[in-house]
């Protein structure tokens, strides 16, 4: 499929060229709304129809479409111009929405009991040797009073979580997945593949000195490093890593970080 992509603006910078966006899951999972219909695939790939990119003070707008005749080219050019005009008229600052105005109802905080049960089970699994490391997560359901626009929140995350990757995945109306992550899965540049082991987080009031001395966090961090390097070796690569982790700061959070 990628061989069928033809870039009509070959002189555009690398970040403005067509991008195929990928979404990965750890496992195949069933959506709650479609639990009886289908399994959500563990990998999704999308070539966006509209692509807007920016570097510094310059921006690029790209329209991806199917062309089979000269009329198709003309129609795409007109759509591109109309979208350009629409963007110029868009307010620079989105409307501010306070969290209190959005929340209509919140489920009772039964998650505390669920978390306590899972925590007890997790500690038993680690103590028995069945697991070396376990990360728990909590799901909280909130009913919104009005339509929610995630863009202002992403803008706030950009300021609060500088250096993180902000993402928004929305293929269907009313179904969006967004957030900010400091982790990089893989990057490939100039023949070099890079990954990052990011595990172990400093507690409140710790600038990172206590984190570097924490035996627990260092052991958990090393498990993540070993897992990544083992996977790379299984795929025929020869990973290189630092002997000691360093500190990586993302907003108010400080993590142990080992580039690979």
Task: Please state what every model-predicted region is.
Residues 94-184, 221-224, 228-231, 235, ...:
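Active-site pocket-lining segments that scaffold enzyme catalytic pockets across diverse folds
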Residues 54-88, 180-259:
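Cytosolic ligand/metal-binding cores
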Residues 1, 20-58, 140-198, 240-260:
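Conserved, well-ordered active-site substructure
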